[in-house]
Design a protein with these regions (language model features):
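Terminal and domain-flanking low-complexity segments
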Residues: 3-13, 170-232
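Anionic N-terminal interaction surfaces
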Residues: 16-111
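Sequence-level detector for tyrosine residue identity
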Residues: 21, 42-45, 69, 147, ...
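Intrinsic-disorder/low-complexity regions
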Residues: 1, 52, 135-136
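Intrinsically disordered, low-complexity coil segments
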Residues: 80, 84, 158-165, 182, ...
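Phosphoinositide-binding peripheral membrane targeting modules
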Residues: 95-169, 179-180, 189
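Gram-positive cell-envelope targeting signals
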Residues: 1-11, 20-27
């Protein structure tokens, strides 16, 4: 038999063995993490993650306080609605009022709570600032918040076993001159593993934990400041 015919079989077996090995490493590393204990480090992680992983947020805020921050996204329904408005050639006064050119954004987006203002940032494909929208306390006091479930744009991308790492969302809806405008709040910062850390499962998991600890506190801090955002 030509040895070349054995190569595909060898690759498949090697792939299966690698997956089993990585799964064991994942389970071992995961068992060493106490999420409740890690949540007590929120203040430390908030500063550490901001300084080391997302320094651009401080740059965009230009010296303003950063009371809480997390990842964000534009719901598909909102993007479709805006797209319909654009395609119909209708001037959307509500969107113009806040100066945001909403579309289906697949690039990084962030929320930052600063004092009584909510800042929404979107980036372009190279991570540079694209849009910066500020919702003041009057807008927020008229807003509503509801649970939105797992981020729908990412469904199907991950295996079922990895669902625990998918961001869960809340949907904040603003009343902009009588027109509802909905945006998503993630319960964790978006994590993209560094290729050099592909075998370092401990580092991957602790980074995910830090991002979750920082992100999931955002809604609670927001609700404490704005009681009208309590979820029924």
């Amino acid at each position: 038999m030509n040895p070349l015919f054995l190569i595909p079989a060898v690759l498949v077996i090697a792939g299966v063995c690698f997956m089993i090995y990585m799964n064991k490493k994942h389970q071992s590393a995961k068992s060493e993490i106490d999420l409740d204990f890690e949540r007590n480090k929120y203040d430390v992680y908030k500063q550490e993650v901001l300084a080391q992983d997302f320094p651009q947020i401080k740059q965009w805020m230009k010296g303003k306080s950063i009371d809480a921050y997390t990842s964000a996204s534009v719901p598909q329904s909102t993007a479709n609605k805006v797209q319909d408005v654009i395609s119909d050639g209708i001037k959307n006064v509500a969107l113009s009022a806040i100066g945001v050119k909403l579309r289906r954004i697949e690039t990084e987006c962030f929320w930052v709570l600063s004092g009584s203002d909510l800042h929404f940032f979107s980036t372009n494909t190279v991570g540079e600032l694209d849009e910066h929208v500020v919702f003041d306390n009057f807008r927020i006091e008229e807003a509503t918040l509801q649970y939105g479930g797992i981020l729908k744009s990412q469904l199907g991308v991950y295996l079922k076993s990895s669902e625990e790492y998918l961001p869960k969302t809340h949907i904040i809806t603003f009343n902009i001159d009588g027109t509802p405008l909905s945006l998503e709040v993630h319960d964790r910062l978006n994590y993209v593993p560094d290729p050099t850390d592909i075998l370092n499962m401990n580092k991957q998991l602790i980074t995910r934990v830090k991002y979750q600890v920082v992100g999931e506190k955002f809604v609670k801090i927001l609700q404490d400041k704005f009681p009208n955002l309590q979820v029924a």
